[in-house]
Structure formats: structure tokens, C-alpha cells
């Protein structure tokens, strides 16, 4: 698993074409999220991501509040064949 810190995520976002996916529920996303993130609840990753991200080499960063749901989302994305997936370890509350 490619775990990164919040600060490392910010650097990647500044320097590379990156998709930032918040995997919290919609209600949690409305309470707290990173700017320019896309909300795709973890339960919807398998159904939605292949239509959203066609390039399997696209850099994708996943996160949630505590870093639990994002681990599941990371695993799903890897199983779907995405190669450049990163997880913000501990979530945005870390």
C-alpha cells in the first residue's frame, strides 16, 4: 500500500495532475473535506470509478476522516487495475 501523509498529498496535488477522492459518506463530506476533492463514498467506488477515471495510470489519492474507509477504497482501486493510487494515512484528521 502506498501510504502518504497529508502534507505529501498536498505536494503531489500541487505538482501533478491528480484526482483527489474523498470516500466518506455524503453527510460526512459536507461537514469536512479537502478542497477540490470528489466525493465517492467507499460503497460506490466499484460502480462509479471506471466511468470517472478511464486512465489506469492516473494518479489518484484517496482519503477519509480517520483513514479506515480509504484503505478499503485503495484496495478496491488496485483490484480494478489502477496503478498510481495513494492513501492519506490516518485520514485528514491525522
Each predicted region: which residue ranges?
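Short, structured coil segments at secondary-structure junctions
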Residues: 33-35, 81
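Helix-loop module immediately N-terminal to the HCX5R catalytic loop
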Residues: 36-61
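Catalytic cysteine-centered active loop of the rhodanese-like fold, especially the PTP/DSP P-loop
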Residues: 52-94
